């Protein structure tokens, strides 16, 4: 990768602006999952240890741009960093006209999405952000697919723009999957909609040996094959696309196993009774909410044969315990495998967290959309600008 790394630059005494992905779930002012914060801490600590004056930017949630909303404030994140770093930490709401920060001090800036022009990569905003620093560090893989003021624009105008350690690790892990994967390769792609992962599915059939669809995606494939799926979630306008993917997979030598048995309910509810049924017995008023025990065994066997595993999305409604067996079994099979495994996407990370398997997956990506776009073979805008800037950076 033609990138200048943060570790290549002497940061001592310099103002270092780090774009992190600190977009964590917060309920009643409390952080409910700190995965992304734990992933970002080493980069922030490394810059502070180097004697830099550090400023951190991030978004949180999806506020109306330009409007302050307390529930989307990064203040709880600043509190978390204060508790987990042995350095002074300040939280600053107004920072576009300048930030006073000393070497060995961290300033956490308020949600970048409160700034008008953030999503549209406004040039004036990008220049204001760039003026805050001597060195800009892009470390937020999770937002690298977005050309926004705090990810792309600032990298254009900062005196120096480099890649952070977390971003480098993410790209290297994906590179291992995309450039020189050990076969056989098994991909598990779950979630509600084929439409959101259509490009990914088409890309994967030409790349992997086995593609296991889950959730609403699997339902669309089943319906396309003529199976009764009752009132299950599926996309009627994508049945032809699903058939095309099945044909394409056959041409490419990619196996797409579909469920032979499922777990159904009558309503989408945590209290809804669950029933195991063979696919041929699904009734017109059934809702498929998980894979059945026979399918679980088949999928686990396929995972155990893999040397490379890609996981994006649950295979059932794992938020409801009675429909979580499939996702749990898949997660444990991946964790127990000796294969190189990479997992990404919000629901996937939530499942990994729920089953306490963080240490048993080879690499857990902090990205959702960026993870998918990398797997689709797309160039991430925020990485592209770093590569362009790298041509002109002098390391010292």
From Swiss-Prot:
What top-level class of enzyme does the UniProt entry assign?
A: transferase
Gene Ontology terms, MF aspect = ADP binding; ATP binding; phosphoglycerate kinase activity
Annotated positions binding substrate: 21-23, 36, 59-62, 113, 146
Keywords of the record: ATP-binding, Cytoplasm, Glycolysis, Kinase, Nucleotide-binding, Transferase
Please name the PROSITE patterns in this protein's record: PGLYCERATE_KINASE
Q: What residues bind ATP, as annotated? A: 197, 319, 345-348
Which superkingdom, per the lineage? Bacteria
TM segments? none
Q: Which residues form the signal peptide?
A: none
- State if Cytoplasm is listed as a keyword: yes
GO biological process, alphabetically ordered: gluconeogenesis; glycolytic process
One Pfam family of this chain:
PGK
Q: Which compartment or compartments is the protein found in?
A: Cytoplasm
Q: What EC designation does it have?
A: 2.7.2.3
The GO cellular component terms are:
cytosol
Associated pathway? Carbohydrate degradation; glycolysis; pyruvate from D-glyceraldehyde 3-phosphate: step 2/5
Q: Which reaction does it catalyse?
A: (2R)-3-phosphoglycerate + ATP = (2R)-3-phospho-glyceroyl phosphate + ADP
**Could you give the subunit structure recorded for this chain?**
Monomer.
Per the record, the similarity remark reads: Belongs to the phosphoglycerate kinase family.
The protein depicted here goes by the name Phosphoglycerate kinase
């Amino acid at each position: 990768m033609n990138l200048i790394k943060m570790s290549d630059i002497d940061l001592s005494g310099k103002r270092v602006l780090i774009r992190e992905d600190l977009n964590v779930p917060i309920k009643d002012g409390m952080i409910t999952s700190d995965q992304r914060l734990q992933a970002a801490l080493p980069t922030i600590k490394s810059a502070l240890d180097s004697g830099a004056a550090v400023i951190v930017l991030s978004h949180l949630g999806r506020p109306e741009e330009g409007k302050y909303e307390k529930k989307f404030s990064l203040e709880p994140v600043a509190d978390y960093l204060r508790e987990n770093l042995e350095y002074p930490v300040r939280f600053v709401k107004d920072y576009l006209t300048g930030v006073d920060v000393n070497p060995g001090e961290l300033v956490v800036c308020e949600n970048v999405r409160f700034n008008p022009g953030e999503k549209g990569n406004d040039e004036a905003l990008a220049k204001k952000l760039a003026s805050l620093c001597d060195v800009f560090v892009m470390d937020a893989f999770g937002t690298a697919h977005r050309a926004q003021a705090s990810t792309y624009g600032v990298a254009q105008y900062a005196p120096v723009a480099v890649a952070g350690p977390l971003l480098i690790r993410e790209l290297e892990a994906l590179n291992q999957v995309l450039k020189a994967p050990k076969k056989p390769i098994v991909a598990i792609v779950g979630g509600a909609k084929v439409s959101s992962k259509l490009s990914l599915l088409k890309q994967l059939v030409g790349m992997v040996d086995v593609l296991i669809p889950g959730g609403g995606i699997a339902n669309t494939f089943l319906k396309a094959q003529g199976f009764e799926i009752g009132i299950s979630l599926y996309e009627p306008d994508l049945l032809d696309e699903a058939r095309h993917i099945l044909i394409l997979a056959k041409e490419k030598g990619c196996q797409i196993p579909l469920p032979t048995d499922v777990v159904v309910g009558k309503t989408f509810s945590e209290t809804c009774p669950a029933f195991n049924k063979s696919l041929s017995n699904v009734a017109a008023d059934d809702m498929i909410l998980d894979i059945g025990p026979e399918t679980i065994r088949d999928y686990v066997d396929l995972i155990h044969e893999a040397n490379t595993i890609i996981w994006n999305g649950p295979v059932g409604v794992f938020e409801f315990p009675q429909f979580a067996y499939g996702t749990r079994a898949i997660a444990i099979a991946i964790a127990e495998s000796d294969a190189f495994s990479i997992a990404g996407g919000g629901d996937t990370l939530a499942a990994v967290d729920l089953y306490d398997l963080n240490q048993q997956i080879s690499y857990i990506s902090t990205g959702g959309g960026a993870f998918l776009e990398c797997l689709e073979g797309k160039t991430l805008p925020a990485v592209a600008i770093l590569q362009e800037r790298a041509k002109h950076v002098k390391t010292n």
